């Protein structure tokens, strides 16, 4: 016996409505992470209660693999916490975040090359590690924008951060 299905003209709008409602509900739970600009980063970098985080791979942070249009190095005072470090178990990654000084009591300003990896890291801090969205900032312009202003510099390894020889990625990978 052959089953009779409703016509596509009836099913398609119902599926569309269902998908739309799921997207609408999901958007209500999106973390509301604020995008900031270079002036905000300059103003708050190094201030008590703030931490600037470079979400790029360690080689970019250290200036060993510059990209076209972006010289190597990092924003002064930034710590390195590569986005790929999020791949581990939540308890281990939480320990790495704390060791890097990325804690819930600070406002975290995250950057990368163009704001994509930093947005992902910001999203994970809010969703997975329960950081308050108001305390997580994404520098969307990141290093591409940063180097356009002659007042801004990218530094080579900075021993003040404690990450030049002992980066979060080295600890995570057991190096």
Where are each of the predicted segments found?
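Short, surface-exposed ligand- or partner-binding patches at beta-edge/loop junctions that are enriched
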Residues: 111-112
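Active-site flanking residues adjacent to catalytic metal/cofactor-binding acidic residues
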Residues: 53
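Rhodanese-like catalytic fold shared by cysteine-dependent sulfurtransferases
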Residues: 2-50, 58-107, 116-175
């Amino acid at each position: 016996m052959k089953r009779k299905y409703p016509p596509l003209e009836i099913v398609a709008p119902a599926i569309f409505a269902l998908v739309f409602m799921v997207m609408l509900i999901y958007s209500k739970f999106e973390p509301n992470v604020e995008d900031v600009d270079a002036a905000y980063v300059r103003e708050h970098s190094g201030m008590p209660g703030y931490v600037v985080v470079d979400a790029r791979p360690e080689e970019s942070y250290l200036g060993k693999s510059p990209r076209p249009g972006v010289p190597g190095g990092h924003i002064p005072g930034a710590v390195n916490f590569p986005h790929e470090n999020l791949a581990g178990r939540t308890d281990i990654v939480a320990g790495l975040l704390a060791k890097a000084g990325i804690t819930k009591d600070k406002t975290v300003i995250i950057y990368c090359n163009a704001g994509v990896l930093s947005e992902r890291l910001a999203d994970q801090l809010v969703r997975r590690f329960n950081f308050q969205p108001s305390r997580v900032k994404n520098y969307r312009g990141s290093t591409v924008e940063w180097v356009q202003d002659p007042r801004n510099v990218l530094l080579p390894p900075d021993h003040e951060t404690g990450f030049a020889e002992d980066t979060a990625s080295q600890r995570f990978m057991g190096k």
